[in-house]
């Protein structure tokens, strides 16, 4: 508990929930000290309900709980931002966000799309077709797309280049899925390199730092 110095002197503090992957703002609730402590202890978001005058675990009735991934406190120590993994829609209306905002597209969205297609029963799915064919087929397609990116770069056709890069990224994520590689592993490696200093490539074959 000592990690977080939150000012509960006024009783309640606002707590904002944000999707850990998409960074979409999901909802605003309020916590007192007891609700915050329970959130830390259970690993799922618990608010203090002003209408019910009691602790209220988000999703206690619907089952749409909010799994806590990280907690941030603002500079005045009186507002909480919680990164969560939502277990279903956040809003009682069935919307993913109480603010009805669209989910911002990200590479995580692409990864999720590939995963959803892989698990679907849609036999017409191109993703499912590639995964069924296996690594050899996927790597061949990825190589073709990478070559097309190079060609469009040489030609200087920006619009075509962007289109081919999008195709290449899609096939890269299919390949990653086939190999069981999560994008978070790539992010971790990029972060490791980013935090290194005094980079000089020299004759190295592998770029271990930027």
Curated annotation (Swiss-Prot):
GO terms for molecular function: ATP binding; phosphoribosyl-AMP cyclohydrolase activity; phosphoribosyl-ATP diphosphatase activity. Residues 107-210 are annotated as: Phosphoribosyl-ATP pyrophosphohydrolase. The keyword Iron does not apply. Its EC number is 3.5.4.19, 3.6.1.31. It is found in: Cytoplasm. Pfam families: PRA-CH, PRA-PH. Its main location: cytoplasm. Keywords: Amino-acid biosynthesis, ATP-binding, Cytoplasm, Histidine biosynthesis, Hydrolase, Multifunctional enzyme, Nucleotide-binding. GO terms for biological process: L-histidine biosynthetic process. Coiled coil: none annotated. Residues 1-106 are annotated as: Phosphoribosyl-AMP cyclohydrolase. Disulfide bonds: none annotated. Pathway: Amino-acid biosynthesis; L-histidine biosynthesis; L-histidine from 5-phospho-alpha-D-ribose 1-diphosphate: step 2/9; Amino-acid biosynthesis; L-histidine biosynthesis; L-histidine from 5-phospho-alpha-D-ribose 1-diphosphate: step 3/9. It comes from the Bacteria. GO terms for cellular component: cytoplasm. In the N-terminal section; belongs to the PRA-CH family. This is Histidine biosynthesis bifunctional protein HisIE. It comes from Staphylococcus aureus (strain Mu50 / ATCC 700699). The gene is hisI.
